[in-house]
Amino acid sequence: MEVNDNLPFMDGDAAYPESMADHVLEGADWPLFAPPREPVSPTDHAIGLQIARLIPDGGTLQIGIGSIGDAVAAGLILRHQRPGDFHDAVMALEQNRPTGTSHLSAFREGLFGASEMFVPAFLDLMEAGVLSREVDGACLQAGFFLGPTDFYQRLRDMPDQERARIAMRPVSYVNELYGPEDEKRRARVNARFVNSGMMATLMGAVVSDGLEDGRVVSGVGGQYNFVAQAFALEGARSIIAIRATREGPKGTESNIRWGYGHTTIPRHLRDIVVTEYG
């Protein structure tokens, strides 16, 4: 086990005593890996607004790292703090004909977070009063945290009372429903599991981690686990965010395909796919 004083200590069931380690390395306080936050494009913001209206008050939220997760958080904060502006933005995107269920009002109960990765967007939501529904004293359960340097500093500066509202859990606890299932079902009410993909097919499959020529773009991470959870939890939904187009060698290409030679999420687990157009 390596001890690094630069790493903010976040408590929870994931903590374990020093006696469990065969060896403890101290004094090597290396700079932390601190990936910068990606710029949030207008396309990302449009997707974030579309998703923010799908999140019910009193529900549960999972998001991952990246600009779309930040855009979803920005949309939720706008909805909570300036619901009139949020309503107008959604109506403009939907040309005053919103499809599906829309949750447009500010949060009264607030949201509970359950996510493999604790990203800066969750801290933004906590500070804005959106992430406020507590279960056993915590408003967020997460497996690990990652972010830029200022994110780590915000965690270090956090008052103990606020830090106690973040419960670090084993990844296996957050990503799966089995184990203390009744406990998890009680916490993960009306869950919305939000993940990003590169492409989706008209049959419902999602491509997130690789290309059909075998090239690996990313790991699957917990995406499959959370999509599967959405089908196992009452009232839960899986939401896949995909930019409608990309720039290819021959110009603009659609990310909504009839079929594709690689699949991350199979078509039988299809649910909600959101682009900047709806």
Kindly give the residue locations of the regions a language model identified:
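Conserved alpha/beta enzyme-core scaffold
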Residues: 1-277
